[in-house]
Regions:
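Acidic (Asp/Glu-rich) sequence patches and key acidic residues
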Residues: 1-157
Length: 158
């Protein structure tokens, strides 16, 4: 199992409805979103496409993507950091089983602009796999030198 990230475009009204749900209903609604086969998957060649797409699935690379974008772990990131919000959201709906984060529509343009200004390839190239390991970035795959090229390629696709 493990932790993974999926991204869905919903309206502010839908985000507010999610905020109002009890834990069991919230889990059910999120499950419905993840099983919606009519939603389009995003083009992962450019991260800012996440903000325009219906669905984006980063699987288990969300924490590594956050680290490349911000240089910090999620717990160390400053409030209102648009690059952090792009990965984790800003309005948090927590349950015992999952973290659900939302981004209000008013923040999307600023976050998209911040993503557009990032030289992701340069940031990724500046990091060593040992940097991810030292920061305890999930998933724990950073001690596999034979997979480094594949890991970097997967992160670049994010």
């Amino acid at each position: 199992m493990g932790m993974y990230a999926g991204y869905y475009r919903i309206s502010d009204a839908e985000l507010e409805q999610l905020r109002q749900l009890e834990e069991r209903a919230l889990l059910k609604r999120v499950e419905e979103l993840t099983e919606d086969e009519t939603a389009e998957t995003c083009d992962l060649d450019k991260m800012w496409d996440v903000l325009r797409a219906e669905v984006c699935d980063l699987d288990k690379m969300w924490d590594a993507l956050h680290f490349v974008l911000t240089g910090d772990t999620l717990s160390d990131t400053a409030d209102h950091d648009p690059l952090s919000e792009a990965v984790c959201g800003s309005d948090f709906l927590l349950t015992q089983e999952m973290h659900v984060g939302g981004i209000p529509a008013r923040r999307v343009k600023e976050i998209a602009q911040a993503l557009h200004e990032v030289d992701f390839a340069a940031r990724l190239a500046a990091l060593q796999m040992s940097d991810f390991a030292a920061a305890e970035i999930y998933p724990n795959i950073w001690d596999r030198p034979e997979e480094e090229d594949d890991i970097r390629a997967e992160l670049q696709e994010c």
